[in-house]
A protein has these predicted regions:
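Positively charged n-region of N-terminal signal peptides that target proteins for export
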Residues: 1-5
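Bacterial N-terminal signal peptides
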Residues: 7-16
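Sec/Tat signal peptide C-region and signal peptidase I cleavage site
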Residues: 17-23
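Local sequence-structure signature of Cys/Sec-based thiol-disulfide redox active-site neighborhoods
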Residues: 24-53
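Second-shell loop/turn segments in exported
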Residues: 31-37, 61, 72, 109-118
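Extracytoplasmic/secreted envelope proteins and their assembly/folding machinery
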Residues: 43-50, 66, 70-73, 121, ...
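Thiol-based oxidoreductase modules, predominantly thioredoxin-like and allied folds used
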Residues: 55-69
Length: 135
């Protein structure tokens, strides 16, 4: 009976440690962007927003116009010309409140109308707040 209790306790400790390690893992954020004029103010706003989360995020930036950026696009299956995509834990779509938000293109109201997405910086901050709340 004592051995069973020790085994059960050991299993509980291992499960607890693995859950704790998972909870501490930073949220992965990947940003594909075009490194030129019209997008630069948006990139600055995104960097400012991401900096609020410190080590709760693991952020990587990929310049659309470089060979590394092209490889990243291929890895993500992107073939179209898009100025900006933000993936949060491997998805460009997040549920923000009751709506699905896709972080593609310029934020609403900024940049050329043709390239505007249907998201705002507030949507991005809210999505990041949600995924980092438990970290």
């Amino acid at each position: 009976m004592k051995q069973i209790a020790i085994v059960v306790l050991a299993v509980l400790v291992m499960v607890s440690l693995s859950l704790s390690a998972h909870a501490l893992k930073p949220t992965k954020v990947e940003v594909l962007y075009m490194n030129h004029g019209p997008l630069m103010s948006t990139v600055k706003q995104i960097k400012d927003a991401l900096s609020r989360y410190g080590d709760k995020l693991s952020v990587s930036w990929h310049d659309f116009d470089t060979s590394e950026g092209e490889q990243f696009m291929a890895k993500k299956g992107l073939k179209q010309h898009v100025p900006l995509v933000i993936w949060i834990d491997d998805s460009p779509v997040a549920t923000v409140g009751a709506k699905k938000v896709e972080f593609v293109g310029f934020p609403t109201g900024s940049g050329p109308a043709f390239f505007q997405g249907k998201w705002t910086m507030d949507d991005l901050r809210t999505a990041l707040d949600q995924v980092t709340a438990k970290k």
